């Protein structure tokens, strides 16, 4: 697929082959890849789909990957030198001529209704060629909190009854707390990244 995209986009105007802000990509890492990323500070990458929209990256494939995978959202700065823009689909979908052409040719476009006709520009997508993904490019780490019942038990100091659980639900909603899968960023993310790096280096003997 990547080869076909490259072939059909090679003659497009330059504005469809550049990005003007940072973009993001969610990856579900296996335990092996998590260790490789922590030990080597990078993972090999190739042609891949990115988005301008952090919210899209966070919600991709249902949000935080299931237990057993490590969810990571990488960020690429548009001024970084180590990537190439294959095609900026977001910019393409902002082009009225392209949108009109898609609409007029929709009967000849494979899976139009479930593909570009459905998503259109909702994913703010860019296709990049990236040699490596590094720990310094991690914008968010995915993880899971304890269950609601476990958290309520910690809060009340005992197994909560129905009335207490309702009160706990109220407190969670009032304070806008997410129970279950969540993304951590900033200083909290940095602490988790450093912990994973140190753990991976110990396990792989790369210290």
PLM-predicted stretches and their roles:
Residues 1-21, 43-44, 54-71, 77-207:
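Conserved NAD+-utilizing ADP-ribose enzyme module
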Residues 5, 31-32:
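Short linear interaction motifs
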Residues 33-46:
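Short, polar loop/linker segments at the starts of domains and inter-domain junctions
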Residues 20-30:
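Short hydrophobic beta-strand segments
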């Amino acid at each position: 697929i990547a080869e076909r995209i490259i072939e059909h986009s090679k003659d497009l105007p330059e504005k469809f082959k550049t990005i003007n802000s940072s973009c993001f990509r969610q990856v579900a890492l296996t335990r092996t890849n998590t260790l490789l990323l922590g030990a080597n500070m990078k993972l090999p990458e190739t042609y891949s789909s990115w988005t301008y929209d952090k919210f899209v990256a966070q919600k991709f494939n249902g949000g935080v990957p299931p237990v057993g995978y490590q969810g990571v959202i990488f960020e690429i700065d548009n001024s970084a030198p180590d990537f190439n823009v294959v095609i900026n689909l977001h910019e393409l979908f902002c082009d009225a001529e392209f949108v009109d052409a898609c609409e007029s040719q929709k009967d000849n476009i494979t899976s139009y209704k479930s593909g570009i006709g459905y998503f259109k520009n909702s994913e703010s997508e860019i296709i990049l060629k990236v040699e490596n993904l590094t720990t310094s490019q991690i914008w968010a780490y995915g993880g899971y909190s304890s269950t609601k019942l476990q958290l309520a038990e910690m809060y009340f100091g005992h197994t909560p009854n129905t009335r207490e659980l309702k009160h706990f639900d109220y407190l969670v909603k009032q304070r806008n707390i997410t129970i279950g899968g969540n993304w951590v960023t900033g200083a909290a993310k940095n602490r988790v990244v450093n912990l994973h790096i140190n753990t991976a280096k110990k396990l792989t003997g790369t210290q």
